[in-house]
Design a protein with these regions (language model features):
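Metal-associated gating/positioning segment near the N- to mid-region
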Residues: 1-55
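Active-site mouth loops of central-metabolism enzymes
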Residues: 2-15, 36-38, 61-74, 142-148
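Divalent metal-coordination and catalytic microenvironments
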Residues: 3, 24, 28, 60, ...
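Short, acidic/polar
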Residues: 13-21, 70-81, 156-157
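Alpha-helix-loop-beta-strand connector modules within alpha/beta enzyme cores
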Residues: 45-63, 107-121, 270-274
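Histidine/acidic residue-rich metal-binding segments in metalloenzymes
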Residues: 76-242
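His/Asp/Glu-enriched, well-ordered alpha-helical/loop segment
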Residues: 139-167, 235-236, 240-242, 247-317
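C-terminal cap of metal-dependent C-N hydrolases
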Residues: 260, 311-361
Length: 361
């Protein structure tokens, strides 16, 4: 997985590196990229090493911050973090608003073939918004975030990429317009890749009619037209990978009035179920590629080999076996999933990696 929040250090009541790795394994993952939105943020060599030291059954790859302490002002010591083991660079959920800073970052990482990961969002447009702007937000009377905030930054990021000829990965893509812009940029042979979450593929803004804060995410759930455009983009190869955007939130952060609830959803452990629920023409082989081969290719990680004598990196799963997602099976310290207490189809049976394995009964 290439975009997960494990909250450690600083917010260990929600998740730790250890529990986050357990959640990832239970979701069938052998590798997870950890975003830098911690306290202190992953802005130094020491912070990168702190995450790297947790490698066990699941390999944790730190994403170093682009700006010092994710403040969006000055560039962080990205090359030092790269040498210490940072897989890529991003300000995570705190998207880069300063175009000059992003321009410098793209130029800088190009010198060592680094990659910037960015969620496209103009926060001046989305501030105070609680959900997607559209018919549903009008009907239920919630302040909204216009999808143009994503589209503008997708366009900006692509143009900065064109100017620098660097590498960027856009994640959390949620609008039809953004997908169209990325598709066009790829045709022009720009080095842009992108990922989408399982919940943006599965759910639309209609889920918020009940004011269920578990569906409050950022980028927000969009229109049914956007959702279908995302599925089409997976089918035609415009979308390169699936990213979990796993965001643990404590009970107190979610069980409040919708306006005050924090954004985010647990999603690592339920990836398989959510993809199997999707009505699409996408084969299970294609999903596996979007979750494993493609991210490894983009971020220059070795592809595991299934042959005699090779180290096994394997996930064994059933597409039909049911399991109940509850306090007993949940590996996270948080419970903020709309699927909690439900019986789900599609079960991870065993994960093998780093000469270790875990079997799920």
């Amino acid at each position: 997985d290439l975009f997960a929040d494990f909250c450690d250090p600083g917010f260990e009541q929600k998740e730790t590196l250890s529990t986050g790795a357990m959640v990832a394994a239970a979701g069938g993952y052998t590798d997870a990229f950890v975003i830098p939105n911690t306290n202190p943020p992953t802005s130094s060599k020491t912070a990168v090493e702190y995450i790297k030291n947790e490698n066990d059954l699941v390999n944790l790859f730190p994403i170093g911050s682009v700006s010092k302490n994710i403040e969006g002002k000055d560039l962080a010591e990205m090359y030092d973090m790269k040498l210490a083991g940072a897989i890529a660079f991003s300000d995570g959920r705190k998207t880069i608003q300063n175009s000059g800073l992003l321009l410098k970052a793209l130029q800088y990482v190009k010198t060592f073939e680094g990659i910037i990961i960015e969620i496209p969002e103009d926060r001046e447009i989305t501030k105070n918004g609680l959900m997607n702007e559209g018919v549903v937000s009008t009907q239920i009377g919630l302040q909204a975030k216009a999808s143009i905030a994503e589209d503008i930054h997708t366009y900006r990021n692509i143009e900065l990429l064109r100017y620098t000829q660097s590498k960027i990965h856009l994640t959390g893509i949620s609008t039809k317009k953004s997908i169209d812009l990325i598709r066009q940029a790829k045709k022009q042979k720009l080095n842009v890749t992108c990922s989408v979450t399982t919940y943006h593929l599965l759910y639309s803004e209609q889920m918020l009619e009940s004011y269920n804060s578990h569906f409050k995410v950022n980028p927000p759930l969009r229109t049914e037209e956007d959702r279908k455009a995302l599925i089409k983009a997976v089918e035609d190869g415009t979308i390169d990978c699936i990213a979990s955007h796993h965001t643990p939130q404590s009970w107190d952060d979610k069980q409040v009035e919708f306006a005050y609830a924090q954004s985010g959803m647990l999603s690592l452990q339920t990836t398989l179920h959510m993809l199997l629920k999707l009505e699409s023409n996408i084969t299970i082989d294609k999903w596996v590629s979007l979750l494993s081969d493609q991210p490894r290719k983009i971020f220059s990680l070795p592809q595991p080999k299934l042959e005699a004598g090779a180290d096994a990196t394997l996930t064994i799963f059933s597409t039909t076996e049911p399991w109940t997602y509850n306090e007993k099976s949940n590996q996270s310290l948080s419970e903020n999933s709309p699927l909690f207490q439900e019986t789900l189809q599609g079960k991870i049976l065993c994960v093998i990696n780093n000469h270790k394995h875990r079997i799920y009964e």
